[in-house]
């Protein structure tokens, strides 16, 4: 972990937290977004964007012993991360972090909103963990858990922010920075979810796989 941390500190680039989710979902998609500026919308991404926008209807909601902060800017100088949190749930605790906009001490729990129904996706957990890492640096605290909230069925999943998950965040950061610094384009790898991707036509995973197969055949013949 220390070796990975040192690699990150030696680099000047900052990356968006959401790119970690892209990277672990599909490395090809992540490299297309970074290197060719491709980030098109389709019916699936547009629906998710509309639902996401409803999350940010207000900046704060404060109750007696708890509060919610929406659309909070996040950063980590140590890990070269920037981004926004959909929602931070704040629970009053004298041992927690002082939050100036709430004028009190709170424990913080990041909540990432996702389109669709409840499902256990690793890339979502990694994105959530990266948000927690930023909050820990910003407020000098330790966060042990966060939540994934699924909009369509109004359910949420508790995520324990384990050492294993944190290691995956660090590995993802280093690999994304390599894509940027080395112009590293990942090859396509077709899977069932590919046709729903907004970059499906640009990526052309089936065509690339066929071309690669033909090339290998010719190399064997020659």
Range-by-range predicted roles:
Residues 25, 86, 130, 193-196, ...:
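Generic detector of isolated residues embedded in canonical secondary-structure elements
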Residues 136-222:
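Metal-dependent nuclease catalytic regions and adjoining charged, substrate-binding loops involved
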Residues 1-110, 210, 219-222:
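Metal-dependent nuclease catalytic cores that hydrolyze phosphodiester bonds in DNA/RNA
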Residues 65-175:
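Mg2+/Mn2+-dependent nuclease catalytic core
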Residues 26-28, 33, 47, 55, ...:
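Generic signature of intrinsically disordered, low-complexity segments enriched in small/polar residues
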Residues 10-20, 123, 185-192:
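Structural motif
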């Amino acid at each position: 972990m220390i070796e990975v941390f040192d690699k990150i500190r030696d680099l000047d680039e900052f990356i968006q937290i959401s790119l970690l989710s892209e990277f672990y979902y599909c490395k090809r998609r992540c490299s297309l977004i970074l290197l060719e500026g491709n980030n098109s919308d389709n019916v699936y991404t547009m629906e998710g964007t509309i639902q996401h926008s409803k999350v940010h209807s207000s900046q704060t909601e404060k109750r007696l012993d708890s509060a919610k902060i929406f659309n909070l800017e996040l950063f980590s100088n140590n890990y070269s991360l920037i981004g926004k949190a959909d929602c931070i749930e704040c629970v009053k605790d004298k041992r927690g972090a002082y939050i100036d906009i709430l004028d009190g001490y709170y424990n913080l729990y990041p909540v990432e909103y996702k389109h669709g129904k409840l499902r256990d996706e690793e890339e979502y957990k990694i994105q959530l963990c990266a948000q927690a890492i930023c909050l820990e640096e910003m407020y000098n605290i330790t966060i042990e858990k966060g939540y994934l909230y699924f909009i369509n069925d109004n359910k949420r999943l508790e995520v324990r922010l384990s050492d294993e998950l944190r290691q995956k965040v660090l590995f993802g950061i280093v690999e994304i920075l390599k894509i940027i610094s080395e112009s590293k384009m990942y090859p396509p790898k077709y899977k069932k979810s590919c046709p729903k991707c907004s970059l499906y036509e640009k990526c052309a995973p089936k065509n690339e796989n066929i071309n690669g197969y033909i090339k290998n055949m010719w190399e064997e013949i020659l």
